[in-house]
């Protein structure tokens, strides 16, 4: 074995478009080499990108997939009737809640920032997430 891990990302436009379908795929394959890329912005379907659905959406995903996360993505989604992704900190994803859930399931890996296409957006998103991580870590500033 090469030690490689294949990451599957739940996304409304993918075949694996719900946490339930992802769980079914993981269970059917039964391989420790198949894991989840957790991107909370991707969990929202058309008509569901609204603040009132955020926590229940994240809770469901972590209940089904939390023990199988290989990588976290830091992307956001704007409140919209459709799907409108944006840089972390500019949308409705509850990042403190996301980070709490990552900690709860023992995730200690990296978070990849993406979905930032404008000048300075990555820097702004990185600063936003550093602040959320510091808050979650009792005020210590992460690297």
Model-derived features: where do they sit?
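Acidic/histidine-rich catalytic cores of soluble enzymes
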Residues: 1-92
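Glycine-/small-residue-rich active-site loops that bind phosphorylated ligands and cofactors
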Residues: 13-14, 117-120
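Alpha-helical elements of Rossmann-like donor-binding domains used by nucleotide-donor carbohydrate transfer enzymes
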Residues: 21-24, 60, 97, 124-128
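Short acidic/histidine-rich active-site segments
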Residues: 75, 108-115
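Short, flexible loop/turn segments with low-complexity composition
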Residues: 114-115, 139-143
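C-terminal helical cap(s) of enzyme catalytic domains, especially alpha/beta-barrels
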Residues: 120-139
């Amino acid at each position: 074995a090469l030690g490689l891990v294949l990451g599957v990302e739940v996304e409304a436009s993918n075949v694996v478009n719900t946490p339930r379908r992802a769980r079914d795929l993981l269970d059917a394959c039964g391989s420790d080499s198949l894991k989840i890329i957790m991107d909370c912005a991707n969990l929202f379907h058309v008509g569901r990108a609204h603040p009132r659905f955020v926590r229940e959406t994240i809770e469901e995903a972590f209940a089904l997939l939390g023990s199988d996360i290989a990588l976290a993505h830091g992307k956001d989604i704007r409140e919209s009737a459709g799907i409108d992704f944006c840089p972390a900190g500019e949308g409705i994803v509850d990042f403190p809640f996301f980070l709490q859930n990552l900690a709860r399931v023992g995730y200690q890996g990296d978070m990849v920032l993406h979905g930032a296409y404008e000048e300075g957006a990555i820097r702004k998103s990185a600063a936003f997430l550093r602040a959320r991580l510091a808050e979650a870590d009792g005020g210590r500033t992460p690297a």
